[in-house]
Regions:
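Active-site-proximal segments of metal-dependent phosphoesterases and phosphodiesterases across multiple
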Residues: 81-84, 119-150
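Active-site metal-binding loops of divalent metal-dependent hydrolases
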Residues: 7-9, 35-38, 66-68, 127-128, ...
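Anionic-ligand binding region
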Residues: 143-153, 160-166, 171-176
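Glycine-rich phosphate-binding loop signature in dinucleotide/nucleotide-binding domains
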Residues: 23-27, 57, 116-118, 149-151, ...
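Beta-strand-turn-beta hairpins that frame and shape the catalytic cleft
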Residues: 1-4, 113-123, 168-172, 200-202
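Core catalytic region of metal-dependent phosphoesterases/phosphodiesterases
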Residues: 2-102
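Acidic, His/Gly-rich catalytic cores of divalent-metal-dependent hydrolytic chemistry
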Residues: 170-176, 180-292
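Short beta-strand scaffold segments in enzyme catalytic cores
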Residues: 111-114, 163-167, 190-194
């Protein structure tokens, strides 16, 4: 029995296609999806179409992530999202999803349990079983804490974009990393496999190459690059460096704000300092320079 695990796609449909090919090559019996399917990259409906196709052809299990929660909250309650701002990328994502896409993500749970005959039960979630935005990272102690709280021997989660495994006594936590927006310095898609010939599961973390440059070109040709202020340019550069530039911009902007509200001006200054808005990356098809 072999399971394929995908998380944090972030609308990177080309990376997801590459991971699907790897899952098919390894003949995975069950495909598990841990949320954050959309936002950040262009054409979110293309990612949703891949999920629908996978659901038809394979035994798939899904939970929602925090990005799906953002989209659904905007859909149901409205928000002050605007283009040319820190929320422009989310607004682009929402406006490029269909009614069926919204219905699909709305129906997803935030946690589920996979029970396969003769094998240890597996709990799946995005961050933690009780909240999508709980951050489990290597060394921060949260994986052990959440493992202690769940009944199942295996817990699968994403959100941190950091692939790792952790054991607590007879329990196992696996984070497959990010399919679509890597942060560990290697610009290749990340996923995981779990394999078992008996009762217990053995994890394997995998990196899968994909056409990064094509994804960056899509961010530009779709108009997303110019609709989201700092965020989309940071993601575009992150896709070719594997470094968490979007988060770095936010953290630097918080310091510039000196305890006050972070404004778009702070974010743009942070992005310039980090080379996100000023660098021209011709060889990757990314040619964006802020002039304001």
């Amino acid at each position: 029995m072999r399971l394929a695990v995908f998380s944090d796609v972030h609308s990177n449909h080309l990376a997801l296609e590459a991971c699907f090919q790897e899952a098919e090559r390894q003949k995975a019996d069950v495909w598990i999806f841990l949320g954050d399917y959309v936002s950040d990259c262009a054409y979110p409906h293309k990612t949703m179409e891949l999920l629908y196709e996978a659901k038809k052809e394979h035994d798939c299990r899904f939970v929602k992530g925090n990005r799906e929660e953002y989209i659904l909250d905007h859909h149901k309650n409205g928000s002050d999202w605007n283009y040319q701002s820190t929320t422009g990328s989310l607004l682009y994502t929402y406006e490029n999803m269909t009614a069926d896409d919204l219905k699909f993500i709305d129906a997803l749970p935030i946690t589920d349990v996979i029970r396969l005959p003769g094998h240890d039960a597996i709990r799946i979630c995005h961050g933690a079983p009780y909240k999508t935005r709980v951050l489990l990272e290597p060394g921060n102690g949260m994986a052990a804490r959440v493992l202690h709280e769940v009944e199942e021997p295996v817990l699968l989660g994403g959100h941190s974009h950091k692939p790792f495994t952790e054991r607590l006594e007879n329990k196992l936590y696996v984070n497959p990393g990010s399919v679509g927006a890597q942060t560990c310095g290697v610009a290749q898609s990340e996923m995981a496999f779990l394999e078992s010939d008996s009762k217990s599961w053995v994890p394997q973390l995998v990196r899968v190459p994909y056409d990064n440059a094509a994804v960056v070109r899509e961010i530009e040709e779709s108009g997303l690059l110019y609709k989201s202020s700092v965020w989309a340019p940071a993601i575009a550069k992150q896709l070719v460096t594997g470094e968490n530039l979007a988060l770095s911009c936010l953290l630097r902007a918080e310091k510039l704000a000196e305890g006050g509200a972070v404004t778009d001006t702070h974010l743009k200054q942070a992005a310039r300092e980090l080379g996100v808005l000023q660098e021209r990356i011709h060889r990757y098809g990314y040619d964006y320079c802020d002039t304001q």
